[in-house]
Amino acid sequence: MSKQLKTSFLDSIAQIAPAEWNKLIGSDYPFLQHEFLLSLEESACVSVRSGWKPSHLIIKNHDEKLVALMPLYLKNNSMGEYVFDWSWADAYYQHGIEYYPKYVTSVPFTPSVGPRICIAPLEDEQAVLTKIISCLQQQANSSGASSWHVLFPEKKLSDQLADLGMLQRTGCQYQWFNKNYADFESFLQSFSSRKRKNLKKERKKIQENNIQFEWLNGHEIAPEQWQSFYRFYQNTYLVRGRSAYLNLPFFLELARLMPDQILLVLAKKDDAYIAGALSFKDSNTLYGRYWGCDEEWQFLHFETCYYQGIEYCIKQGLQKFDSGAQGEHKIQRGFEPVFTFSNHWIAHPQFSAAINQFIKEENQHLSRYQKLAEKYLPYKKNENP
């Protein structure tokens, strides 16, 4: 079976038709859509210069039918990945070995779990995955890459890759789940009284400061509103002395290509926009991605990024709010700690063994951490997951 499969690497997502790529994805998960990946490339946010050289993998059968695909990048740094391997790179350097370049299967700058290897429904998944692993190992050896990393795959795929010999690493994020809440107040009723009081206090403070909010879908966002949001987004990085990963042309291109999957929350005070949060959505999930502000107000971040998103999910019937990487402060606001996964193939045998041991210890720590973190959820005891 695998001998009949032909692999090809694409220097750009533009080398495959959007309809052909999106059909095989088989879902409306926004970040793997052809339009999203194309916007990253066309805006030059993803390029050799930024450390992300596109090398997307497609597989066709003997009839030239597309049977599998995955995003793939040859990387010369670890920026914008959110699965941190800096210590691995340092260890390589200390031993006089090059860690970069490396291959990464992910969505650039996007720590969101979703499809990573898409396989046609009637294909033998085991055979296709075996072919892909073999292909990437050969490609890494011929190009001098140290490794291949699959970041934020769905658990099923991660387990399949682990069964085929790749290392499996665990991470933790915080997600909100819609338990058929009628409105925000019914969500609050699931809290213990003290936690409910605290959250109401935070929202009341925003109201007392006369801060109001607008929800805008992609086609409703005016150019000047995009300018305001992008200024906020840049501020988030500038306060840390860094430049933003993404540029304004990227966002404008997304608004043109996939407006129905964009939600912009803007905060306004005295007729001026002061903060904003940009999210993406599919039929099931809201994905919180970017935030920033011009003015600092108490609890403004929580309201703009979390409470407005929760309200939107309840009103639109979305089942999950994926709020992105990090942020333990989300726990007491109703976001549950959930495991994320990544898979790794390391070419160097000794380093592979050492990293495997590192991952085992890290996974044990995260398992203990999740159990501890769940104790701090605000829900009444009988509401706890």
Give residue spans per PLM region:
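N-acyltransferase acceptor-side catalytic subdomain
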Residues: 1-385
